[in-house]
């Protein structure tokens, strides 16, 4: 993979200049960016940011921007569970694509606060896995992936309000949607051209 220089932002403070990498600067505005395949390392960083932002202000929304092809189911579920665990509502915004676990996280945002831009692409499907080893080990792994498949389908049905039978049918193969189709499906709430207005603190 070619090296991509990290952009830095310089700000003036009463103590002089201070520089931030672009992601740290976005974090100051309660923006978390998920722009890579999802693995344990990526999940740990996203989870740490969500927990930090909750400790900073438990009553102010967090924005999770997603441009991801998906990745590890367990890593994605760790992020999803943290989104539900933290007190701030987590708004999700899809730029580019949200596929596989990326789409799952997009759908798992706070109700009414799940967005995609007009040219975004969303794809859902069943979890994939390849196994080697003794027949009994392969059988154990196959049963586990079927358990995860059922769990993911149940959660998607809850967030989209689609019948479980439709979720099971649609995720049997890669199911691609544009932003408008994703709204009709219930994966997002709105297609947006401009950034949503900043969310104020919840009323006490």
UniProtKB/Swiss-Prot annotation:
Localization, UniProt: Cytoplasm
GO biological processes: protein quality control for misfolded or incompletely synthesized proteins
GO MF terms, alphabetically ordered: ATP-dependent peptidase activity; ATPase binding; serine-type endopeptidase activity
PROSITE patterns xrefs: CLP_PROTEASE_HIS, CLP_PROTEASE_SER
Top EC class, one word: hydrolase
Record keyword Hydrolase present: yes
Pfam families on file: CLP_protease
Signal peptide from the UniProt entry: none
Catalytic residue list: 100 (nucleophile), 125
Primary subcellular site in the record, as a coarse category: cytoplasm
CDD domains with a match to the protein in the record: S14_ClpP_2
Keywords: Cytoplasm, Hydrolase, Protease, Serine protease
EC id: 3.4.21.92
Catalytic activity: Hydrolysis of proteins to small peptides in the presence of ATP and magnesium. alpha-casein is the usual test substrate. In the absence of ATP, only oligopeptides shorter than five residues are hydrolyzed (such as succinyl-Leu-Tyr-|-NHMec, and Leu-Tyr-Leu-|-Tyr-Trp, in which cleavage of the -Tyr-|-Leu- and -Tyr-|-Trp bonds also occurs)
Keyword Protease: yes
GO (cellular component) term, any one: endopeptidase Clp complex
UniProt record similarity statement: Belongs to the peptidase S14 family.
Subunit structure: Fourteen ClpP subunits assemble into 2 heptameric rings which stack back to back to give a disk-like structure with a central cavity, resembling the structure of eukaryotic proteasomes.
Function, in words: Cleaves peptides in various proteins in a process that requires ATP hydrolysis. Has a chymotrypsin-like activity. Plays a major role in the degradation of misfolded proteins.
Name this polypeptide is given: ATP-dependent Clp protease proteolytic subunit
Species this protein is from: Anaeromyxobacter sp. (strain Fw109-5)
Source taxonomy: Bacteria, Pseudomonadati, Myxococcota, Myxococcia, Myxococcales
């Amino acid at each position: 993979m070619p090296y991509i220089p990290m952009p830095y932002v310089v700000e003036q403070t009463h103590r002089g200049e201070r520089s931030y990498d672009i992601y740290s600067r976005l974090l100051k505005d309660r923006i978390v960016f998920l722009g890579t395949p999802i693995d344990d390392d990526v999940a740990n960083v996203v989870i740490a940011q969500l927990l930090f932002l909750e400790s900073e202000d438990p009553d102010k929304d967090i924005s999770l921007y997603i441009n991801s092809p998906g990745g590890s189911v367990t890593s994605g579920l760790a992020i999803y569970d943290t989104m539900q665990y933290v007190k701030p509502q987590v708004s999700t915004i899809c730029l580019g694509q949200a596929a596989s676990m990326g789409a799952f996280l997009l759908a798992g945002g706070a109700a009414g606060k799940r967005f995609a831009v007009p040219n975004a692409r969303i794809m859902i499907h069943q979890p994939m896995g390849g196994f080697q080893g003794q027949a009994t080990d392969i059988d154990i792994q196959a049963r586990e992936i079927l358990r995860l498949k059922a769990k993911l389908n149940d959660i998607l049905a809850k967030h989209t309000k689609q019948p479980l039978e439709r979720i099971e049918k649609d995720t049997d193969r890669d199911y691609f949607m544009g932003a408008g189709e994703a709204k009709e499906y219930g994966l997002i709430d709105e297609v947006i051209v401009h950034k949503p207005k900043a969310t104020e603190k919840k009323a006490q």
